[in-house]
Amino acid sequence: MYDVTEWKHVFKLDPNKDLPDEQLEILCESGTDAVIIGGSDGVTEDNVLRMMSKVRRFLVPCVLEVSAIEAIVPGFDLYFIPSVLNSKNADWIVGMHQKAMKEYGELMSMEEIVAEGYCIANPDCKAAALTEADADLNMDDIVAYARVSELLQLPIFYLEYSGVLGDIEAVKKTKAVLETSTLFYGGGIKDAETAKQYAEHADVIVVGNAVYEDFDRALKTVAAVKGE
């Protein structure tokens, strides 16, 4: 079974966006620790299955980050289920977990399911709107949510700025209070220099939008983070 505490870099692919097969092959063989499939809108069973079938041709771990229960399909190595700690809607805090367990609990191994303590810190992003997150947060708010993740013993605390570069001081202070939760950071990582800078404080760097904006620059983040 895969151990997320050993990861340093992951790519996040949106099943609602197209990526040429040649680029997908390069990405999957880049040395990244995993490929996460997930998005905020337009996520369907069909496009998730299509993306998974392409990624599964390679050895890289393939993860589904669940944002729609109806889009859960078998065949992934891991299933990340986000608990959006700063959501105003209980469905996004624990409701989705209950629904997933009710629908698929008897079919899935508990070793394949990983709960993420999500903290969305960009109030203008699609993820904040989808999850009804109170995302206008200051540094103390973010650190407090990280402490909640520790309290709940969540294996992952995901600090999500979704498309914009977050406050690196917030990342530093968040990391300082986490002892058991692995810190995933996502948002605005578009080049090797920025990836390396944020990797000094986060356990795992998530590169998503950059894959579609400038593939070659996004690819260089792997070596920058992993020191290869």
Swiss-Prot record:
Listed GO biological process terms: glycerophospholipid biosynthetic process
Reaction equation(s) it catalyzes: sn-glycerol 1-phosphate + all-trans-heptaprenyl diphosphate = 3-heptaprenyl-sn-glycero-1-phosphate + diphosphate
UniProt keyword terms in alphabetical order: Lipid biosynthesis, Lipid metabolism, Magnesium, Metal-binding, Phospholipid biosynthesis, Phospholipid metabolism, Transferase
EC number of the protein: 2.5.1.n9
Residues engaged in binding Mg(2+): D14, S40
Gene3D superfamilies on file: FMN-linked oxidoreductases (3.20.20.390)
Positions contributing to sn-glycerol 1-phosphate binding: K12, Y158, L159, E160, Y161, S162, G163, G188, G208, N209
Xref: InterPro entries: GGGP/HepGP_synthase_I, GGGP/HepGP_synthase_sf, GGGP_HepGP_synthase
Cofactor requirement: Mg(2+)
Pathway assigned in UniProt: Membrane lipid metabolism; glycerophospholipid metabolism
PANTHER family from the UniProt entry: HEPTAPRENYLGLYCERYL PHOSPHATE SYNTHASE (PTHR40029:SF2), PTHR40029
NCBIfam families assigned: GGGP-family, PRK04169.1-1, PRK04169.1-3
Function per UniProt: Prenyltransferase that catalyzes in vivo the transfer of the heptaprenyl moiety of heptaprenyl pyrophosphate (HepPP; 35 carbon atoms) to the C3 hydroxyl of sn-glycerol-1-phosphate (G1P), producing heptaprenylglyceryl phosphate (HepGP). This reaction is an ether-bond-formation step in the biosynthesis of archaea-type G1P-based membrane lipids found in Bacillales. To a much lesser extent, is also able to use geranyl diphosphate (GPP; C10) and geranylgeranyl diphosphate (GGPP; C20) as the prenyl donors, but not farnesyl pyrophosphate (FPP; C15).
Subunit structure: Homodimer.
Family label: Belongs to the GGGP/HepGP synthase family. Group I subfamily.
Other notes: The HepGP product, which is the first archaea-type G1P-based ether lipid being identified within the phylogenetic domain of the bacteria, was found to be subsequently dephosphorylated and acetylated in vivo. However, HepG and its acetylated derivatives represent only a minor fraction of the total lipid in B.subtilis.
Identification of the protein by name: Heptaprenylglyceryl phosphate synthase
Organism: Bacillus subtilis (strain 168)
Lineage: Bacteria, Bacillati, Bacillota, Bacilli, Bacillales
